[in-house]
């Protein structure tokens, strides 16, 4: 029998980065209960996990309309993923494009595993929506960020758990400039500033210098994309080309 007793709540995949923080705000605007979930999988930029608590605390302090909705946080040790992955996200190697055309920051199976674990937790917690920051427009080309992948995964999870999860991907068709705009629409300039200062995107974990667009090395693909998105957002434009 299909489980139908899930409450009006969401579990958000929350890494501590720009996209997932925007998704937390998006969920807080729509659901009565929002819980967050992070994973420690041996990522080089583990500093992003250290940003999670600061982002959550800032959301509670600066947005009283959301504070009562923000529920428990869950952090899962997924070091096994790092141990079986040979990528620039989990190894101190140069970031480059692999022979298959994907950047070597791609961690095979990562989002599939993240969403499956999220579904298991949401099932136990009685939450219906699973929210992730996957998108097809940030030029990385990760196959586990594609809309088709998420739709297929929703079907598989619902069949496998005999329930009615909804996988929400509010950033799926947004570029980085649009993501900044969404933050402004959700929480105005205060949310944009919170995300600029409190979140982390840099692949190499650099957090010693605050740029106009946030902390980072300024040279890795993630930093370049975040900067281009922020600059385009300020100009009222879109990001139309991949970072050089």
UniProtKB/Swiss-Prot annotation:
Give the reaction(s) catalysed. Answer: 7-carboxy-7-deazaguanine + NH4(+) + ATP = 7-cyano-7-deazaguanine + ADP + phosphate + H2O + H(+)
Q: In which pathway does it act?
A: Purine metabolism; 7-cyano-7-deazaguanine biosynthesis
User: Please, one GO biological process term?
Assistant: queuosine biosynthetic process
What's the domain of life for this entry?
Bacteria
- GO molecular-function term, one example from the UniProt record: ligase activity, forming carbon-nitrogen bonds
Residues noted as binding ATP in the record, renumbered to the chain:
14-24
Alphabetized UniProt keyword annotations? ATP-binding, Ligase, Metal-binding, Nucleotide-binding, Queuosine biosynthesis, Zinc
Q: Which cofactor does it need?
A: Zn(2+)
Co-factor: note:
Binds 1 zinc ion per subunit.
Q: Where does Zn(2+) bind?
A: 202, 217, 220, 223
**NCBIfam families (UniProt xref):** 7-cyano-7-deazaguanine synthase QueC (TIGR00364)
Protein known as = 7-cyano-7-deazaguanine synthase
The organism of origin for this protein? Burkholderia mallei (strain ATCC 23344)
Q: Which gene encodes it?
A: queC
